[in-house]
């Protein structure tokens, strides 16, 4: 399987999530879908030019995508317990879910949380796919390591294996 085929497979898998049964979870999944799709397209474009370009996508384009979709009472993003980008901190309400996903790998279903003022939070896990290992794995190329060290001096987002929990997608919205 070529690199591009593996990449496409991994990114398609990346945006697919289990169907949640409750209305709030379905709404959360629907709200997150455009973010995941736009991020996927941006990563595909970056990876087509090499893994080093994907670093720029994650650093520059992903926050812009999240900001552009965070409107009309919707806030969304990505977070992790092992941050690469210090701006991707976990919202306080999502921290217990991230901790649960981290400590209970068998229970990583999407979850919703009732928040104050008729707001709902929704969280989905982000799992490491084979193509992610170029930038998040245990053995990084010298060019990737150099670029990561320059872009993210306090990077903690390496050392993963396929299937590991990378972090979460989260969204907060009005019910």
Task: List the predicted regions and their residue ranges.
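Extracytoplasmic c-type cytochrome modules immediately beyond a signal peptide or single-pass transmembrane anchor
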Residues: 21-129, 143-175
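The canonical Cys-X-X-Cys-His
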Residues: 129-139
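Bacterial N-terminal signal peptides
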Residues: 7-16
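Positively charged n-region of N-terminal signal peptides that target proteins for export
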Residues: 1-6
